[in-house]
Amino acid sequence: MDTLEKFLELRAFVNGIERRGLVYGASFSEFVIMRAIKQEGSAGIRRVDLADAVALSVSGVTRALAPLEKLGYVERLDEALDARVRRVGLSPSGAALYQDISENVQERMNQVSSEMQELLLSLTK
């Protein structure tokens, strides 16, 4: 498979995830943010750490979180040791949405070639 074919298959994969994600009410970018939050567990994650995890600026993360907060998928968590620190975590409905989209992504992964799976997995390391 040449580079152009790989790129087109990757783009089709992401477009498919994006379309299905929109059915659930979250874009692929929002899914990536939710994934980073989910990986931190119930303690949540500081916005600055979330920005590092998803390669956005802190203000970019703040803008991306706004619709997720408005829809009730993400909630602000208080920091026990320092009131100035703000963390965000997934709400129960956000965790359920994340699970639904994750299963959908896994289903899509099973439909792409093994070569594309290896490429996708290498991009997440």
Model-inferred region functions:
Residues 47, 65-66:
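Short, hydrophobic-biased segments on the C-terminal half of alpha helices
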Residues 1-24, 71-73:
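N-terminal leader segment of winged-helix/HTH proteins
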Residues 8, 32-35, 99:
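A cross-family signal for key residues in well-ordered alpha-helices
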